[in-house]
């Protein structure tokens, strides 16, 4: 992951900004104005592309399942509604990722109600390359407050949770988070037997490619499908940085350029959605699950992150700092390590996740940090200019595609906020290959321990939002109860095409 470097020194005033009164400035008048602007964009898009028929308004649920409702564009143009939106039942954030079972404990209210998904006009309105009669936009949830009779941000919306975290960090310290993800996935050729077993899945990919890391031949074997995937991503405005084959047969990684963290999460979703769709239309299954095959390496979505000030200068690098990082970024990392066990519940949400998180798997399960250390929870990537310019970003290695990126990033911001606010210095860094000699703590080795750590972490739950933390905990416990009753292979087959 390459980021522009900026050696601007940290301003000590960053610690003295006591403006921590943050709120989401989305009153009804602004929402209506935004809707009018969206209507004009739709008119322009329809005029340029007469084939357009539907606009998909998308949301990401607690379990990181991509969901959508599609509105007929002609209906919008004929009716010109005051507020373009779709209504969704308020149980939508209590559903399991693999079945529409309601988790009652996840809901604050026992009453049925509606949440209103309103398109976000600051996100891109993309024509879908794999379904060119549809355009897509992300939405955020609001609810009608009975007392004020006004629309308010819904507390069970993951996107709203991240926005609150972004506002908190910016208003208190004048800092914003930028980043991107390493998107790792497997491409599996659909077989004649419908890939009814994990063994048949493995056989189908090994027929094509006996992969190794950065294998030149792998890009040739999968050249046609990879070209369609990368073209589709670029058509949606995603700037691709790198493409490479990973260590597994049929395993690849695509990295997208860094950006503000909310947009990075949106791009992360678009990548998975696009790769899944293009693969399916071309006779492949694309899977992002953490550990589809025991004999092959797992897939993660490592997050590369950096801290920026209000002048859009990178606060992360400092050539004279530990591991080439500024003091503020070291404190941020101190907070992340302090909360690492609780964050694991947000990052790794299925039993399958923990088959990837093992020592010597380079998955970051050691609660430590270090320069170029692939065994540490936080790795500091070096560059040819690290000695003179410092290091421009830090990497969290454990995150996988079962995580809701908005909740994961909200957790990261609040953990880092704690580190900055309380000047939490991280332990000494290490770059030892074998960290077992250091007696480092490990992150939880199973979801039950991770979720218990999150439940007991009142600071994180309160700041992420007690309502959405409760929903996450109960939905994931319900999912994991079902998954734990299945064999490892049946778990894989159940999750294979969900992530």
Curated annotation (Swiss-Prot):
It comes from the Eukaryota. It catalyses: L-glutamate + NH4(+) + ATP = L-glutamine + ADP + phosphate + H(+). The keyword NADP does not apply. GO terms for molecular function: ATP binding; glutamine synthetase activity. The keyword Transmembrane does not apply. Residues 158-499 form the GS catalytic domain. Belongs to the glutamine synthetase family. This is Type-1 glutamine synthetase 1. It comes from Dictyostelium discoideum (Social amoeba).
